[in-house]
């Protein structure tokens, strides 16, 4: 009990707050339940930890665009979504972000956190229950999605999974063609 860190999955060693991304999440969720943790939190081997000094990782991973990518190309555990740092995260075709994009994404992500903070009694699972999301949290995610869709090249907020997939694969084709 004096040294609980000795039993943790080695990986992220940090003395600053970090973002936790679940390895497996329900396929029924509209958003990936991503969370910020303090350095003294020990995450299990079922959570990916990532440093996120400016809130960009949180915002991107919390968007509809990202979970659409994850649902489309990511792995599965039974029928649930399975996050992978290599396929899901590293393959995500995020364009180069301007300073303005970064600031807007960070602010939109902060709005999501503030909406969650209105109900501190709720767990992440309760916040993201498919039929039980608080309207304020839904609105915050809508704002994040509007920003993320614009960054990905949408002329307006995407309304369907198919619209997002078309953008994602166009961006992916563009990025992989440029690297040759």
Regions from the language model: what does each represent?
Residues 1-107, 111, 173-180:
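Polybasic, glycine- and aromatic-enriched phosphate-binding surface used to engage nucleic acids
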Residues 94-180:
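Non-catalytic DNA-recognition/assembly elements of restriction-modification systems
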């Amino acid at each position: 009990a004096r040294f609980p860190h000795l039993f943790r999955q080695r990986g992220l060693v940090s003395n600053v707050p970090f973002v936790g991304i679940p390895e497996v999440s329900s396929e029924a969720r509209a958003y990936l339940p991503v969370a910020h943790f303090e350095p003294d939190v020990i995450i299990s081997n079922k959570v990916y930890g990532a440093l996120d000094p400016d809130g960009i990782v949180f915002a991107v991973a919390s968007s509809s665009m990202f979970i659409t990518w994850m649902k489309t190309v990511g792995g599965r555990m039974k029928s649930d979504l399975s996050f992978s740092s290599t396929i899901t995260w590293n393959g995500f075709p995020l364009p180069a972000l301007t300073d303005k994009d970064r600031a807007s994404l960070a602010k939109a992500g902060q709005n999501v956190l503030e909406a969650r903070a209105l109900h501190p009694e709720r767990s992440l699972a309760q916040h993201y229950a498919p039929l039980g999301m608080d309207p304020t949290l839904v609105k915050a995610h809508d704002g994040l999605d509007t920003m993320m869709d614009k960054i990905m090249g949408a002329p307006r907020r995407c309304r369907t999974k198919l619209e997002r997939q078309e953008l994602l694969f166009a961006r992916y084709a563009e990025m992989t063609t440029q690297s040759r």
